[in-house]
């Protein structure tokens, strides 16, 4: 996986968290930098850990699935991308549900619950990464840093932007995941030909 693909993956994986952060920022009277960075750290850590868990699960099964690994990566990334696009086009998403279920006071537990709700897809991406020649530590660090920056910015921008761009980030993230999955499949099939 190229460095550009890893960075794009990091930003694609952080779009759900960014949308949630915009919602949290919009719900706060006056978001402070301290609150925004705290949210970014919580989301970033969770978003960095979940692909590692998925990667470990994928590695455990990789010997049995090696002949189909490129199709699995393509299928998982494509399905997740399509899901994100559909959620972005609908009025409601997992992010909206997570926001509804969290209290108005955004304590650490509420942040962690929302962080886990928005990082389930990162675990599935981690499974697909187990079949690729990629250093999972680098990917996890990039995903965590992208999420940290996107969530911090999202909380601060939330008051001004609100619902205007929240859904569009999910759509963009979905398109990026589909493109990465398609690139993996293309590279494998063209290399095998």
From Swiss-Prot:
Transmembrane segments: 3-23, 37-57, 66-86, 109-131, 146-166, 171-191
Functional summary from the UniProt entry: Probably functions as a manganese efflux pump.
One family name in Pfam for this protein: Mntp
This protein's name: Putative manganese efflux pump MntP
Protein's cellular compartments: Cell inner membrane
GO molecular function: manganese ion transmembrane transporter activity
Membrane topology: Multi-pass membrane protein
HAMAP family: MntP_pump
InterPro entries linked: Mntp/YtaF, Put_MntP
Keywords: Cell inner membrane, Cell membrane, Ion transport, Manganese, Membrane, Transmembrane, Transmembrane helix, Transport
Homology family: Belongs to the MntP (TC 9.B.29) family.
Native species: Xanthomonas campestris pv. campestris (strain B100)
Recorded name of the encoding gene: mntP
Any single GO CC term annotated in Swiss-Prot or TrEMBL for this entry: plasma membrane
